[in-house]
Curated annotation (Swiss-Prot):
GO terms for cellular component: plasma membrane. The complex is composed of two ATP-binding proteins (MetN), two transmembrane proteins (MetI) and a solute-binding protein (MetQ). Part of the ABC transporter complex MetNIQ involved in methionine import. Responsible for energy coupling to the transport system. It is found in: Cell inner membrane. ATP binds at G58, R59, S60, G61, A62, G63, K64, S65. Its EC number is 7.4.2.11. It comes from Mesorhizobium japonicum (strain LMG 29417 / CECT 9101 / MAFF 303099). This is Methionine import ATP-binding protein MetN.
């Protein structure tokens, strides 16, 4: 299956150029939406710049689905404004809203393909609804199926496809009308890990080749980590944290972000975590989160030469997110000398590390 996209395969409008990143495709201003007495969206303000991938993450019931319905005009907010390419959709009637919706493509968790239609007919469906000539529809479908690596499946029916292939058809269909914005609503949640990686790689390639703006809704931090440029964390209808992905991963501020990151951030080995005590013991265990220069420099060797006394690295490592080094180290500080422990923590914080005392162990690690 060909997943590589060459310049000759770029299927945007012939006049397409890499968009100006200073312009916003989406701008939300103090958006609010209630269902009864329950706020689904509670004052969200957000921008999505041209050509970027923004990930919106939160637990079930956080307001993600309501937000995406407000973006495509299927849900009217109680107050606030939704701008798509500079147009406030709340001021548009249904007739004016339809052409704007065609500027928005969408892919879904469960694909939403028409089982009685062939793959190429599913891809061409948005163009058929627009009344485009059959020859144009079929030519566009062929381009898109080549893009997503499914040219040989054009005459097949959805029932014969794997889950990953169905989602590729969904992506091709979402691109049929050359949208300015692609909304992805939990598009990989029903897929196995290997297929998820291939779909995310395809979306990233499409973003790079076409400059397509993507807003993806997910509850999986690994999805955000894989392809997003920025992330916004939603809880109870509010944005509790947002920023570049590497920055949020390196230094999460909110409890909900820390919880969502828990599954993919390095953790203290279970056998050592089980030995932690709140009271002083033979050794103190520190968690040290680093990013940027602190992660790429000789932090531990500098600590050894600058602060007299012993320490041990018991677990951890350095990774790269958005080409930025990000890591977590677990250090053991022997003894009960409070001044030595304070000196270690002071040194690490001076190097822009985030330090947390996890507890103590009664016997050496």
């Amino acid at each position: 299956m060909n997943q590589h996209i060459t310049a000759s395969q770029a299927i945007a409008d012939p006049t397409h150029a890499r968009p100006d990143a200073s312009q916003d495709v989406v701008r939300l201003v103090d958006l609010k939406r209630r269902f009864g007495t329950t706020p689904a969206i509670d004052g969200i303000s957000l921008t999505v710049r041209k050509g970027e991938i923004l990930g919106i993450i939160g637990r079930s019931g956080a307001g993600k689905s309501t937000l995406i319905r407000c973006l495509n005009g299927l849900e009217r907010p109680d107050s606030g404004e939704v701008f798509i390419e500079g147009r406030e959709i709340g001021r548009l009637g249904e007739r004016d809203l339809q052409p704007l919706r065609r500027r928005i493509g969408m892919i879904f968790q469960h694909f939403n393909l028409l089982s009685a239609k062939t793959v190429e007919d599913n891809v061409a469906l948005p163009l058929k609804i627009e009344g485009r000539p059959k020859a144009e529809r079929l030519a566009r479908a062929a381009e898109l199926l080549d893009l997503v690596g499914l040219s040989e499946k054009a005459r097949a029916y959805p029932a014969s496809l794997s889950g990953g292939q169905k989602q590729r058809v969904g992506i091709a269909r979402a691109l049929a009308a050359r949208p300015a914005l692609l909304l992805s609503d939990e598009a990989t949640s029903a897929l196995d890990p290997e297929t998820t990686r291939s779909i995310l790689a395809l979306l990233k390639d499409i973003n790079r080749q076409l400059g397509l703006t993507i807003l993806l809704i997910t509850h999986e931090m690994e999805v955000i980590r894989s392809i997003a440029d920025r992330v916004a964390v939603i809880d109870a209808g509010r944005i509790v944290e947002q920023g570049p992905v590497w920055s949020v991963f390196a230094d999460p501020q909110s409890d909900i972000t820390k919880s969502l990151l828990g599954a993919i951030r390095p953790q203290l080995p279970a056998e050592l975590a089980a030995r932690l005590l709140p009271a002083s013991g033979a050794e103190t265990i520190l968690r040290v989160d680093v990013a940027g220069d602190a992660a790429s420099g000789p932090l531990l060797s500098d600590l050894a030469t600058s602060v007299p006394g012993a320490f041990r690295l018991v677990h951890g490592g350095i990774d790269h997110i958005q080409q930025q080094p990000v890591g977590t180290l677990f250090l053991s500080i022997p003894g009960s000398d409070a001044s030595h422990l304070a000196a270690v923590i002071t040194f690490l914080k001076a190097r822009q590390a985030r330090v947390e005392v996890l507890g103590h162990v009664a016997h050496p690690v």
